[in-house]
C-alpha cells in the first residue's frame, strides 16, 4: 500500500514540476517588442529625408547579420547634407528605430530630420539655437531626429522611453523626437 501511495506521489510531483517548468518558460518568453529583435528575421527600414527629398527602403539585417551594402546606403542617407560628409552610423540606432516601429505597430516611412552632423555643422546650428548640444551624439553617428506621419509625437516618445535603449528627446514645437544610442 505504501508503495502505491509513493508512486502516485511521485507521478503528481513530476506533473507539478513539469507544469512549473512550463509556467516558468512562459514567464520568461520575450515580450513582443523584445521579440522584434530577438527573433532572427530580416529588419527593413523605410525612410524619407525631409531635407534632401530622398527616400530609401533598406533591409539592413537579414536575420543572421548586418548587410554591409545596406548599412553603407543608410550611412549615405543619414549624411550631413550641408557639408556632404558621411560617417558610419551606429547599427544599434537602426535596430532601435526598427524596434520602435514594432512597438508603435507601424512600418510607415520614418521622416528623417537630422542624422549625422559634422562638428562644423553642429557648431553652426549651435550658434543659431540653444537646443543643440556641444557634444551632440549626432556628430558621433549615434543620433537621429525624426517623426512618423500619422503617429502622435507623444506616442513615439513614450515608446522610445519604454525601450530604455538610449537617450530620448521630445520637441513637440519642432515636430520631432530625438533618439540616440
What are these regions (language model features)?
Residues 2, 43-48, 131-181:
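Catalytic cores and adjacent binding grooves of peptidoglycan-active enzymes
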Amino acid at each position: 500500500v505504501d508503495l502505491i501511495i509513493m508512486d502516485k506521489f511521485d507521478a503528481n510531483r513530476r506533473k507539478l514540476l513539469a507544469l512549473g517548468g512550463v509556467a516558468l518558460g512562459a514567464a520568461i518568453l520575450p515580450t513582443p517588442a523584445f521579440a522584434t529583435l530577438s527573433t532572427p528575421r530580416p529588419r527593413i527600414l523605410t525612410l524619407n529625408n525631409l531635407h534632401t527629398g530622398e527616400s530609401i527602403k533598406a533591409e539592413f539585417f537579414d536575420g543572421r547579420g548586418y548587410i554591409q551594402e545596406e548599412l553603407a546606403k543608410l550611412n549615405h542617407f543619414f549624411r550631413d547634407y550641408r557639408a556632404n560628409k558621411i560617417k558610419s552610423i551606429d547599427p544599434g540606432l537602426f535596430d532601435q528605430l526598427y524596434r520602435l516601429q514594432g512597438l508603435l505597430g507601424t512600418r510607415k516611412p520614418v521622416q528623417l530630420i537630422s542624422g549625422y552632423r559634422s562638428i562644423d555643422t553642429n557648431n553652426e546650428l549651435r550658434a543659431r539655437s540653444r537646443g543643440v548640444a556641444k557634444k551632440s551624439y549626432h556628430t558621433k553617428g549615434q543620433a537621429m531626429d525624426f517623426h512618423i506621419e500619422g503617429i502622435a509625437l507623444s506616442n513615439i516618445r513614450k515608446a522610445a522611453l519604454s525601450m530604455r535603449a538610449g537617450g530620448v528627446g521630445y520637441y513637440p514645437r519642432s515636430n520631432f523626437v530625438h533618439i540616440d544610442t
